[in-house]
């Protein structure tokens, strides 16, 4: 049979006839394709198919003789019929495979022919698969169309679509033809998809990262704003000669020694575009109400209302001689739902004490010094940070002054950023936004401040490290209560203590930790314990030895309690004159309880009274205990120690309420004390500053001198993440010299220096200078205030410490930190 195949010399697409074995006209049985090895010779009706195959107009593929490029699919869908109505067989191989409708007298010959055919085709098939991978896909698509196309006439059982699809796949590989139109190859789709989706989803991620980078450290995103990078070519070229050229800028005598440029800690130059977020938030930042001559009054009450992230309850530092009316709008604006939680039968707060006569923290002179600052300019040009501890404790003489003013002002809702992860933001989380409130929540009654004594049983044995969970029914140890604390079974239920903020307690688990972009954790000695953000500290217990998990203990175990002192220093430096430095330091002490303590209190309704003593308190002034939770003995003779005990019924009620509102919480932070530290001018600032400007029409020279001051701290600790930000106006066209390297934001016209840490171990003992020269097109520049930010942990500026008195509780952690509030320096 193969003899007839070799007689054909015509080629189709360069393929020899012997490769196209099904195109012979001399063998009717091979008109279309090789028969199946099981296919017998055709008789009766099959003869019509052979006769029809010999006619030039009836080729099996619907094309004239010698043309084998395209298949006439219409012919397959509507096959020709013979005189009796049978369709003429198209001579396709395998179409009747497995269907024996005829005799098998020639089955052996057909099988042998098929074997020879397979021997010849297999190498061609593998070769063509490699060369014509796309053609295979096209043919598969075409065959699929055949299988899905219904025939309008009676189908022949020999034309099974499955058989055609199954047997033609290998045959079509050996017979490459001009394919019918098919969709685009998939190899082109990735590029096309990228181009099509680019306008919808924006540029690729790489370009987004190239265009958006944070300009400053993540501690204060709203201060510096988010930024965009600057090309290295835009960076100011360094001069070959030392800066400044010629005579350095004249500096007045100063307490801060001028030293050579600090180059020990160069910073990576990367700029940012932080205009939108920064300007929007600057408009919302409330200013501190004291030091009005320096920082100015609140510009817009509505801006305070919009800024939900800063709507904390503050202590008011308004003295009777000037109760700032700026706080009144804040009272009207902040109306969280916590007010509804206060029962109507709560005891009335104690009567307000006589007006205090204490003076402001700083020297009285600065009150009358004309302010060199324009607050609007400061808030619009300088990215300020809100430090919420700056509004309270200025002249209150006693905790009783927190009187009735706070009843009308419920605590504000928590900021969305910390609602699920923070329990009690630190220094900024003062209490009631009322005019003269030292409490941390409205309607917080004043507990009688009467001295009392109590006898406490010997302390129980220490809890084993394994923390076995004992039966809850066992009696508690140290079941002592203060005689002046309201009994648990009082006729009127104890008032609910929402404390400072509605979110005063919340989950602090590491799984839902804050995002690094807004509230990073400053890790030093114990990671993830306390983090600082916008002038506030936040306390967690991740990393502490015995407090990271919910409480599981028996009735005889001592309850773990953690404490955190967080302080904020606000300072204003005028030139290099130390006598003009105004300083204000505020702080707060927070206690944190594990969530499991509520179950312990439920099983032990009369727990031991929690008593603690604040030591080294001689530098504290205007100490304001939480009047709803704390009792204080004011008759103590020791001026360096203050003892407090907790109103346990109120504490239990508050913790139970919070546990119901926030069942996911792991720890509950409770504000206990607010205080102000007696400041001694520039000696109380951990970082002394002096700024000098030399403004000319064509250029501006800026020099910033700083000095690390160990005398301001009880324990010398490093200042971390120090940032210096200065706006420069006048149309800066070029940075001629910057030492050490800094970040220049061309759009915001601001320069930023970042120093990882400053301490005694730094170059020159923490003394250094920052220098910059700017070429101007619209000079001269107008001097702008310098804004400085830093954090520090491991010490406080007040030197306070805490210790427990009595049994039943133990401190699992005591944390101390401080940070810069409004830390400004002017020319």
From Swiss-Prot:
This is SH3-containing GRB2-like protein 3-interacting protein 1. Interacts with proteins essential or regulating the formation of functional clathrin-coated pits. Interacts with CANX. Interacts with AP2A1. Interacts with EPS15. Interacts with SH3GL3. Interacts with AMPH. Interacts with ITSN1 (via SH3 domains). Interacts with and REPS1. One of its GO terms (molecular function) is microtubule binding. It comes from Rattus norvegicus (Rat). PANTHER family: F-BAR DOMAIN ONLY PROTEIN 2, PROLINE-SERINE-THREONINE PHOSPHATASE INTERACTING PROTEIN 1. The keyword Phosphoprotein applies. May function in clathrin-mediated endocytosis. Has both a membrane binding/tubulating activity and the ability to recruit proteins essential to the formation of functional clathrin-coated pits. Has a preference for membranes enriched in phosphatidylserine and phosphoinositides and is required for the endocytosis of the transferrin receptor. May also bind tubulin. May play a role in the regulation of energy homeostasis. Pfam families: muHD (PF10291). The gene is Sgip1. The modification Phosphoserine is found at residues 78, 104-105, 107, 149, 151, 156, 169, 236, 265, 287, 289, 300, 316, 319, 371, 398, 485.
